[in-house]
Amino acid sequence: MATIKDVARLAGVSTTTVSHVINKTRFVAEATQEKVNKAVDELNYAPSAVARSLKCNTTRTIGMLVTQSTNLFFSEVIDGVESYCYRQGYTLILCNTGGIYEKQRDYIRMLAEKRVDGILVMCSDLTEELREMLDRHADIPKVIMDWGPESSQADKIIDNSEEGGYLATKYLIERGHSKIACLSGHLDKAACVERISGYKRALNEAKITADENMIIEGNFECDTAVIAADQIIEMEERPTAVFCFNDTMALGLMSRLQEKGIRIPEDISVIGYDNIELAEYFSPPLTTVHQPKRRVGKNAFEILLERIKDKDHEKRVFEMHPEIVERSTVKTLN
C-alpha cells in the first residue's frame, strides 16, 4: 500500500507539499499540484483517515443506532440520513440492534472506540439501561429520534404520536364512523400509548364510548395484521373502520380482508400511519397519516452537526407534526 512518502518521491516534492495538495490547506502552484495528483493516481494512494482524524480531531463519521433497518419506516428515515451524510462528506456507520440490549451496549462501545463525531439514535426498544449508557458518553454529541427517551445529554426530535392518533380517528369520525377499531404495536411502547391516547381523545370529543375490545395489539409487522384481520372477521359487530398504527400492518390487514372477500373501503375502511412509499401504490391506495421521514433524517443530521460544532449548546427538543394524506381506503358513511 502506497504511503505519502511514496507519492512525494514520485512527484519530486516534500511530504508537506503532498499534504497541502491533498487537504487543500495552502496555496500550491498548479504545475506542482498536477505532479502530485498524477503521482496519487499512479500509486492509487488513499490518505490515512486515522492519521487525519488524529491531526484534525474529527473522523467525519456518524454512528446510527436503529432497532430494525428493514422496517419500511426506519429504512426511509435512514435513507434520508445517509443521503445528507454523503453530501456533507460524512460516513454513516449503521448499527442494527434488533432491540437486543447486548448489541446496543456493544455498538455504543464500538462507536465510542471509533471516535465517531456524533450518534443518532432511532430505537423503539429504549430502556433506562440504554439511556444510562448513552449518558455515560456525554462527550459524544447525540440526537434522539422518533420513539427515544428524553435525555439530559441529547437533543431530541419528537413525532407527536398523540396528535397523529387524534387526527386519524377524527378523520374517520368526520366521515360517519363510530365503530372504530385500532391495530396497535406493542402496548408498552411510548408511541403506541400516545396514539391510543389520541384515538381515545377523538372518540371522547365525539361522545363515542371507547371499547377496549376494539384495541388489538400487534407488533408493527404483517403477521399480526393477518391475525387481527381474522379477529375482526369473527367479531359479532364488526368495526366500520380500522386505524392501523403503521402502514405495514395496514397493508397486511387489507390484503387479508380482501382475500376473505371483504371490500376496502366498501365494507371496512382502513387508515394507516407513516405514509411509506408503498402505501400510494397498493390497491386501493392507502389513506394514512404522513410523517416526513426524509425530512426527519435531514433535520436530525443537521441538528447533530450543530451539536458537533457547539457541544455546550443548550439541549433542545424539535417537534414534527403529522398530517392526513387522503387516498382511497376510507368510505364516507354520512
Curated annotation (Swiss-Prot):
Domain (HTH lacI-type): residue spans on this chain: 2-56
User: Which PROSITE patterns does the protein's record reference?
Assistant: HTH_LACI_1, HTH_LACI_2
- Provide the transmembrane region boundaries: none
* Listed CDD domains: HTH_LacI, PBP1_PurR
Q: Which GO terms describe its biological process?
A: negative regulation of DNA-templated transcription; purine nucleotide biosynthetic process
**Entry domain remark:** Consists of two structural and functional domains: an N-terminal DNA-binding domain, approximately the first 60 residues, and a larger C-terminal domain, approximately 280 residues, which imparts the function of corepressor binding and oligomerization.
Q: What is this protein called?
A: HTH-type transcriptional repressor PurR
Q: Which organism is it from?
A: Vibrio atlanticus (strain LGP32)
The organism's taxonomic lineage, starting at the top = Bacteria, Pseudomonadati, Pseudomonadota, Gammaproteobacteria, Vibrionales
Q: Which gene encodes it?
A: purR
